[in-house]
Amino acid sequence: MAAKRKSKGVYMISAVAEMYEIHPQTLRLYEREGLLKPSRTEGNTRYYTDEDLERLEFILNLARDLGVNMAGIAIILQMRER
């Protein structure tokens, strides 16, 4: 389910939501739950890097394709980081 990225860089929440066909609130929820950690500008705007998008793709694969709930995703991400 890889979204097409035009170039390396940073992406605003609206662009990421459109690329992955998800609601911006979903991205905010993932951040609130600690699944994603986008950087922020001084004005508090979220910016997602290519690494954030790779992590999002992994999260969406777990949730959509495998049916893993958010608690399960959090555990899998923790295990993956070790």
Regions found by a protein language model. Name each.
Residues H23-T26:
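Short coil turns linking two alpha-helices in DNA-binding domains
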Residues T45:
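Conserved catalytic core of two-component sensor histidine kinases, primarily the HATPase_c ATP-binding
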